[in-house]
Regions:
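Terminal presequence/propeptide segments associated with secretion/organelle targeting
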Residues: 2, 15-18, 22, 29-658
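Generic low-complexity, intrinsically disordered sequence content enriched
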Residues: 8-10, 23, 27
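Short, Lys/Arg-enriched N-terminal segments with co-localized hydrophobic residues
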Residues: 1-13
Length: 658
């Protein structure tokens, strides 16, 4: 449920009005009825009566319909990474501030710092285009399980199975989109037991309309992220544009505001304890069916390792950002992306332990084993499921640390490493000569301009040295790449293992360490030059070691885990035929529902279902950027007149939780 009144002009009311946004808290799904993330086309069969019992005054057809306008037509997949909602007949779209953070950062500069000061387009001409950002509407969902499964058999390896699924999925997608401007994807559900085709209409002209300053949109920062109570004005506005005939089109001044099939009405009455709430959106991923073996690996290895690496990355970025205003803008989105799941993994580990998830998973698995053992047919069909999963995790235990470091510290660590890896592939694929080669080089230059716009050599050099050092001291030496022997045998440096010295020399010699050097390289590019480049040689040494030593084991893990999970999930559904199951999130549309309610996280701990502006003032800390409060907001607070946005007690509510 969302409350919004968009400011029409820059006046005294602007700050007051954008503070009136209130959005449902997402962190406490345990409070949601049946804790489900339900596929919208199945709501009528599975959930309609229960939703109405909780207070829904609509039908399932009102929520999801292929032939008529419904709520699904107001829900948008923003760029494939966030959810947004249509809130007007003129293409206006609401999303989270953190979802628009990349766009806000992209348009910010030292002279126009929209991250710090916020941004409001006072006319359509002032709205800011965002190249590459899309807005996709779900057109329809169709169950194609029977068609896909008909092409599969039990004699197939998992690799053969995946190849056949890709083949038949392409055929299904081609048939579904032929003669239309739609795009589609076949997605697997329940561990590869069910398959649905999702058809979308995707718009490519999405313009930024408004966003509050980060002191409101990110109030509380990492400290309050994934926590309650919170007091964050986490919202931003875009507008979708289309061709005059209403079809998707690339950015053009000739485009017009899109008129959606449906948009969500806005109400300003607020919510009360017990009110029905519903979240409609595109959640990325969940692991509801993770076994005890997966929980143990997360707690023992991957979660803490990820947190440790991101701790270091965040610390290095923060030093650079605090030292220079331009660097602060350059790294704002990178810092936010890194910190979001840094905090998530901290909270997840805490939750897994406090809720004794491992023990609960073991109990489910014991029940499953007993059920399978009761019947020879079940033993034949499902008997190997948990054994395969256990075997996979035993193998993965030996390589999980290496794989986590490869992803977090190498490919997502110092940017110069992955950039060199990516550019080598781009240069290798260049046409030999002629117009096509020039066009391809221009495309590389365009991408490079975007990359170096938000790149700071000093920060990245620190990351390069630190990530290599963490890798060296934490990954088993038996899994070390040859590059670490080179670092050990350096002739110079201020200590025996001087990663700073290695980084300094690598950056001094690399063509990727500055825009100037890279564009000089592009005057006569060659893969031979890249293959001698120290940044590229570093990442390839680590990557090749992984491929040679780890990838075979990883392939075995993948095969066993994929098959084991598929059988285990199928068996669970057969074991409990009367239970309603929902599939893990996979960036497809889902609905979850419940009621507004107070939060009781522990003994003698109680929080109201809403927060107010009083909490903002209580949290204010002028010495902590996360809790800075804008002067204008403090002035409004002192006056205390919130007009139509005041609750029954005359206060201004900020967030609520369900």
């Amino acid at each position: 449920m969302i409350f919004l009144d968009l400011p029409k002009q820059k006046n005294k009311l602007m700050t007051k009005k954008f503070l009136s946004i209130v959005m449902a808290g997402f962190f406490s799904f345990t409070a949601i009825a049946d804790e489900g993330m339900w596929l919208p086309q199945l709501l009528q069969a599975m959930n309609e009566s229960d939703m109405q019992a909780h207070g829904l005054q609509l039908t399932a057809e009102d929520l999801y319909s292929v032939n008529n306008s419904s709520m699904k037509d107001a829900i948008v997949s923003l760029g494939g990474f966030c959810t947004a909602e249509m809130i007007s007949s003129e293409g206006l779209m609401l999303t989270n501030h953190h979802c628009a953070f990349g766009s806000i950062q992209e348009h910010s500069s030292v002279s126009n710092d929209y991250l710090k000061d916020g941004f409001w387009a006072m006319s359509r001409d002032e709205e800011l285009p965002n190249e590459g950002l899309t807005a996709s509407f779900l057109v329809s969902i169709e169950d194609v399980t029977a068609r896909v499964v008909a092409e599969l058999n039990d004699d197939m390896t998992e690799q053969e199975r995946r190849a056949k699924i890709r083949e038949i999925s392409k055929t299904i997608v081609d048939e579904a989109t032929e003669g239309t401007h739609y795009n589609a994807r076949v997605k697997s559900f329940f561990g590869g037991n069910d398959f649905y085709i999702m058809k979308y209409e995707t718009f490519k002209d999405v313009r930024l309309v408004g966003a509050p300053p980060s002191s409101i949109g990110k109030f509380g920062g990492d400290t309050d992220n994934w926590m309650w109570p919170r007091h964050t004005g986490d919202f931003a506005l875009y507008r979708i544009y289309c061709a005059p005939d209403g079809t998707p089109a690339e950015y053009s001044v000739e485009n017009v505001a899109y008129q959606p099939k449906h948009h969500l009405p806005i109400q300003l009455n607020g919510v009360e304890n017990g009110d029905y709430t519903m979240i409609f959106g595109f959640p990325g991923s969940t692991d509801r069916y993770l076994t005890s073996y997966g929980v143990k690996e997360a707690l023992d290895i991957t979660n803490q390792t990820t947190v440790d690496i991101r701790d270091e990355k965040l610390a290095i970025m923060k030093v650079g950002m605090d030292a220079n205003k331009r660097t602060k803008i350059q790294y704002a989105a990178k810092y936010a992306q890194t910190s979001n799941y840094w905090k998530y993994f901290i909270g997840q580990s805490k939750g897994l332990k406090s809720m004794k998830v491992y023990d609960k998973k073991v109990a489910i698995e014991d029940e499953f084993r007993a059920w399978v053992a009761e019947d020879d047919a079940r033993v034949e069909k499902y008997g190997e499921a948990l054994d395969l999963i256990e075997s996979a995790y035993k193998t993965n235990q030996k390589i999980a640390l290496n794989r986590t470091y490869l992803n977090e510290a190498v490919f997502m660590g110092s940017e110069i490493m992955y950039w060199s890896f990516k550019m080598n592939r781009a240069i290798a694929s260049l046409p030999k000569e002629g117009k096509e080669r020039n066009v391809a080089i221009r495309a590389i230059k365009k991408e490079a301009k975007e990359f170096y716009k938000d790149y700071n050599t000093s920060v990245d050099q620190e990351l390069f040295a630190s990530m290599l050092e963490m890798y060296y001291y934490n990954v088993p030496k038996t899994q070390h790449a040859p590059v670490f022997k080179k670092i050990e045998n350096q002739l110079f440096g201020f200590k025996k293992l001087d990663f700073d010295w290695y980084a300094k020399n690598a950056f001094r010699r690399s063509v990727f360490s500055s825009r100037e050097k890279f564009f000089t390289f592009l005057e006569n590019p060659s893969t031979m030059k890249i293959e001698r480049d120290p940044a590229y040689k570093t990442i390839m040494s680590i990557y090749n070691q992984y491929i040679e030593q780890i990838s075979t084991q990883r392939a075995i893990v993948r095969e066993e885990l994929t098959k084991g999970n598929r059988l285990f999930i199928a068996g669970l559904r057969e074991m409990n035929p009367d239970k309603t199951y929902y599939p893990d999130a996979n960036s497809t549309m889902r609905a979850t529902y419940g009621n507004v309610g107070d939060y009781n996280p522990g003994e003698a701990m109680h929080y109201d279902y809403f927060t107010t502006i009083d909490g903002i003032m209580q949290k204010e800390d002028a010495t902590n950027e996360e809790f800075n409060v804008p002067e204008r907001l403090k002035e409004l607070y002192e006056v205390g007149d919130y007009g139509q946005y005041a609750d029954k007690d005359g206060n201004l509510r900020i967030n609520f939780i369900s």
